Regions:
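Extended basic (Lys/Arg/His-rich) segments that typically form rRNA-contacting surfaces
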Residues: 1-258
Length: 258
């Protein structure tokens, strides 16, 4: 099993050569630095503890500084554990894991925190029935009777479904597909949506259910895979061409005036 930590950037659409449109989520996967290696002898299980996104040393405590020093890296904002025999055997403390471990067509699972909804009523939170909508009814989107039958039931039982905070929850979406891998820009394109708001951190791992085979994905036709340097060069060439065009127009105006 392969796994890596990434950050959700947003959603867009890409097209393939046969005209198919894919709604995709762009996930930034910066290099995951291995901070610790959990062993069966010492910890009782095997896993890699990785860090994502650098943190200033002034914002880290002594424990974080010590772990980062052993791995010869800087402290990290997000520290998570990754499981899997493949990444465990191929990486040591101080090494990095990036998006190149995946390929286009790989089936993956995404583990992330869903969006919170704040304070919500019982209709939205638990899908309770809506009351009568006539003008004479006493309620519309409120909960009905709280009473129960039986002895000593003149109270509201613990766990009664009512309105309240609908907080974020850790959610797993199974069997998504990697549409494209771009190691130059440290990003993955994942078909469909993933849980959580923009810029939230998530774990991407190989699919654990029956869909483990690689899915054929057609070649993309409108997706730019240039590096940052190549993009800057293209922009400079465009600016130079525009400047030449403006200079020619100015010369034509001067010649007409003369």
């Amino acid at each position: 099993m392969k796994s890596v930590i990434g950050r959700k950037i947003g959603m867009t659409s890409v097209f393939t050569e046969d005209g198919t449109t894919y709604p995709v989520t762009v996930v930034e996967v910066l290099p995951n630095v291995v901070l610790q290696k959990k062993t069966v002898e010492k910890d009782g299980y095997e896993a890699l503890q990785v860090g994502y996104e650098d943190k200033k040393e002034s914002r880290a405590n002594k424990c974080e500084l010590g772990i980062a020093k052993k791995a010869n890296t800087t402290p990290k904002y997000f520290v998570k554990e990754l499981e899997g025999d493949e990444i465990y055997s191929n990486h040591e403390v101080g090494s990095t894991i990036d998006c190149s471990i995946f390929e286009a067509g790989d089936a993956i699972d995404v583990v992330a925190k869903s969006k919170g909804h704040g304070y919500t009523g019982v209709i939205k939170r638990y899908h309770a029935h809506i009351g009568p909508k006539g003008h004479g009814s006493g309620y519309h989107r409120q909960i009905g009777s709280l009473a129960t039958n039986g002895r000593c039931n003149n109270r509201v039982h613990a766990g009664k479904k009512m309105g309240g905070q609908w907080r974020p929850q850790t959610t797993t979406i199974h069997n998504l597909v990697v549409v494209d891998v771009n190691p130059n820009n440290n990003c993955l394109l994942i078909r469909g949506s993933v849980p959580g708001p923009k810029y939230s951190v998530m774990k991407i791992r190989s699919a654990i259910k029956s869909l483990k085979k690689k899915i054929p994905v057609s070649k993309l036709v409108n997706y730019k895979t240039e590096t940052v340097e190549q993009i800057e060069k293209i922009q400079e060439e465009a600016l130079e061409a525009k400047a030449k065009e403006e200079a020619l127009k100015a010369e034509e105006k001067e010649s007409k005036a003369n």
